[in-house]
């Protein structure tokens, strides 16, 4: 049987595509440093690079583009939904014969033309962002046609994050003596109070870490699986020494630095959701295994004991002091999030079907928010990506993106089982890691606006592409 992946791989491995892949690695490695693309000019520069790489890829493969897109057939439905989602945002910036003076009423009026978006220029910028996210998702799916490329991308994302974590800890303990990327107001927490990486907001950085930390475990699994046959007959001490002195030793050290950095963000949601995502991932993997109930119960018990042991060790080492101090003083107090959520709900009630335009929430929210929130810039976001999406794009936009995301998540979940059946071996750890990463940011977005930081959104789609592609590879 001839595989489309094999035929397509010959095309995609030519030198021109290798250069595109290397350039993509460079772009995603650098992208977290300038505030993760928080400022418009930063991300427009970043998105220009992504669009340029995509254009170069399609020019290089113009003769075989139809064969290339055959590889996307398995996720055709979510890609169609994502395309319609982008077209809906185009519709939001085009003048239409409708009357929206009363936000609750959307009537046809051929004598008065206006846009759905209350600020079309802002929505246009958001459209460019969202288009670049979907573009890099498709480009990554097309480029990841070999096991080596998948591993290389995972290593790039993980090592880049580890370097930022080291930078964060150095500044945390030196009180910002080596700060290269200052926070943008209103996010002005001191380094000793909260590590925030190269970002402004520590919760954004915490979400970034929960995306990239699981990749380290996947890479370690990959190396262990690859070297398992070479270590037959060796003593446990010898295997342990080899582990510590090998690439895996570097990965373990990097993971330690990254996990400590996560604690030092003092992000209650980020740390809690990270643990929850690990638990969810464990039970999803366990569910996919055809094992006796007793064996599953044994694994669950060992997992719980292991989690408790790690938690106790971490707490007693003092690495969680920033987090424990915040929890001691604030607990899980929502810090005004309930009022921010109510603000979003008020806007949704006014224009439920089509929304006010992508990216317009910060502009409109002051008319609806409670006086208790004051004029602080921190309340310009809903601190819930789902509510903000509903207010910006209404039921139509929310349904399109939500359905596409759920279908991709289902594909990722089913891939956990498919990877085991196809015996993709060393990549199975990365398959699990990608599922854990995706679950983490989706859950954290219930209490924050993580997808509004461009680098988090781009890394989400990169890791999602890794998880979707692994089950499709031949051994």
Language model: regions and residue ranges:
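Alpha-helical transmembrane segments of multi-pass inner-membrane proteins
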Residues: 1-15, 19-34, 44-58, 79-93, ...
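Short beta-alpha connecting loops at secondary-structure transitions
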Residues: 324-330, 374-375, 422-427
């Amino acid at each position: 049987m001839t595989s489309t992946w094999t035929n397509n791989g010959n095309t995609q491995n030519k030198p021109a595509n290798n250069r595109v892949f290397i350039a993509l690695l460079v772009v995603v490695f650098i992208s977290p440093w300038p505030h993760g693309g928080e400022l418009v000019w930063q991300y427009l520069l970043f998105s220009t690079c992504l669009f340029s790489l995509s254009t170069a890829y399609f020019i290089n493969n113009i003769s075989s583009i139809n064969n290339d897109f055959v590889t996307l057939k398995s996720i055709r439905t979510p890609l169609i939904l994502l395309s319609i989602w982008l077209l809906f945002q185009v519709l939001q910036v085009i003048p239409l014969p409708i009357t929206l003076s009363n936000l609750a009423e959307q009537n046809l009026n051929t004598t008065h033309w206006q846009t759905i978006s209350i600020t079309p220029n802002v929505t246009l910028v958001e459209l460019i962002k969202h288009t670049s996210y979907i573009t890099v998702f498709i480009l990554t799916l097309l480029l990841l046609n070999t096991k080596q490329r998948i591993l290389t991308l995972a290593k790039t994302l993980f090592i880049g994050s580890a370097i930022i974590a080291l930078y964060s800890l150095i500044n945390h303990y030196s009180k910002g003596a080596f700060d290269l990327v200052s926070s943008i107001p209103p996010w002005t927490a001191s380094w000793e109070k909260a590590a925030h990486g190269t970002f402004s907001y520590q919760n954004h950085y915490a979400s970034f870490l929960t995306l990239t930390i699981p990749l380290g475990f996947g890479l370690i699994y990959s190396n262990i699986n690859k070297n398992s046959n070479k270590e037959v007959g060796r003593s446990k001490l010898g295997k342990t020494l080899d582990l510590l002195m090998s690439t895996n030793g570097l990965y373990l050290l990097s993971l330690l630095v990254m996990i400590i950095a996560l604690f030092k963000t003092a992000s209650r949601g980020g740390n809690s959701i990270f643990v929850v995502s690990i638990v969810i991932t464990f039970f999803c993997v366990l569910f996919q295994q055809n094992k006796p109930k007793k064996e599953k119960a044994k694994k669950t018990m060992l997992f719980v004991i292991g989690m408790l042991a790690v938690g106790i060790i971490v707490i007693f080492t003092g690495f969680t002091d920033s987090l424990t101090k915040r929890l001691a003083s604030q607990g899980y107090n929502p810090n005004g999030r309930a009022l921010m959520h109510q603000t979003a709900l008020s806007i949704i009630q006014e224009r439920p079907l089509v929304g006010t335009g992508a990216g317009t929430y910060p502009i409109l929210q002051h008319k609806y928010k409670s006086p208790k929130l004051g004029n602080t810039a921190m309340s310009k976001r809903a601190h819930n990506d789902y509510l903000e999406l509903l207010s910006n794009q209404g039921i139509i936009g929310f349904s399109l993106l939500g359905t596409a995301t759920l279908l991709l998540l289902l594909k990722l979940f089913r891939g956990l089982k498919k990877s085991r059946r196809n015996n993709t071996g060393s990549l199975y750890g990365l398959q699990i890691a990608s599922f854990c990463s995706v679950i983490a940011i989706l859950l954290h977005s219930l209490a924050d606006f993580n997808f509004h930081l461009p680098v988090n959104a781009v890394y989400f789609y990169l890791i999602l592409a890794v998880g979707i592609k692994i089950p499709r590879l031949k051994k």
